[in-house]
Amino acid sequence: MKNISAALLLPAVAFHLTGCGTQEKKEVKQPNIIFIMTDDHTTQAMSCYGGSLIQTPNMDRIANEGIRFDNCYAVNALSGPSRACVLTGKFSHVNGFTDNAATFNGDQQTFPKLLQQAGYQTAVIGKWHLISEPQGFDHWSILTGQEEQGDYYSPEFNENGKRITEEGYVTDIITDKAIRFLDNRDKSKPFCMMFHQKAPHRNWMPAPRHLGIFNNTVFPEPATLFDDYKGRGRAAAEQDMSLAKTFTEDWDLKLMT
């Protein structure tokens, strides 16, 4: 099971206040919700968790102004199934989406559907990876291709049922799409936007402007680079994602022959 740490900014909510023998009622305002997901993002790459490799000032601000969780877990470490768990609040064997080769049954109850019923305008933008089209969203623009992982450069999107290709880098494009939704949303309604970035998921393709940003930086080797799994169970040694088993010269190291 993958250990996930997340920083959440909790919006202020107005509550009913009760006095001595009298009750003063204040209008309860429905909070706007922005759910931000990055993909395979280790805490060592976030300075708000003490990571020193790079600085992440925007994430740090969210962590400082909200609540930072230091010990929480995803119920499924796979991309699509983990997303299905977030949407449904159910374990994978209950919601039926157990691996990335499956298709999510969007007919079941999800929290965006409940928010719609409560008067929210809902949107999902970025990586979806559930194969089926979104339900419970007034607007969606989700990555397609490469088995729904999407591409880093000039990616294709399914935008409200229409396939479109956007020129540029995927992180910039997803961010611009999210900002456009916020600018053009129905201001008379509260909103919930699920904002899902593809990065930094393998195969680690940066924006062209960042290709040389670490040319003069030497990163320390992690202690587990050549791990012998001493003192741990057999499952750790037999897991698939390791340098020896899955790291490739072309896909990962970008060494062209």
Which residue ranges define each predicted feature?
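Formylglycine-dependent sulfatase
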Residues: 2-9, 20-257
